[in-house]
Amino acid sequence: MSIQKNAYVVMDTETSFRNGLVFDFGWTTMDKRGNVLGSADLNFLDVICKEKPYYINKIAGYARRQRKAVHKVTTFAVGQRLFNLHIQHLKTAGYRVILCAYNAGFDCRVLAGTSRAFGCGKFLRHSVELLD
């Protein structure tokens, strides 16, 4: 029996004022040695068009970061697919996937809510562990 390596997916979300929909989602995945296994920083244009972001005053900063290719602009459905493909890749490579966040319960709840609001079904398509 081999021991699984841990992959820590450190994630963060930013939400809108009105309905708490996620308009900004980012993650960095590392192993226990700090090697980066993947990362993304996504802005969801479909959510921004529908909702007033909580950090509306930061939108200009997001635009600058998008021009520098730090943030990627996409839709929520594409972001969800990218995240789940990343998780699938980690699991296929034999990693034990652990989601981490300052308030992981909140992040998971608002991601699931945004997924429902945009008709994308369950946000997470793979079983993972949660570290809050």
Language-model region placement:
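Short, surface-exposed, charged/polar-biased interaction segments
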Residues: 31, 48, 120-121, 132
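Short, conserved catalytic or adaptor-binding loops enriched in Gly and charged residues
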Residues: 1, 29, 121-125
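Conserved non-catalytic scaffold segment of RNase H-like nuclease domains
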Residues: 2-9, 13-105
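Substrate-recognition/cap helix-loop segment adjacent to the acidic, metal-dependent catalytic center
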Residues: 105-130
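Residue-level detector of functionally special positions within alpha-helical transmembrane segments
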Residues: 58, 129-132
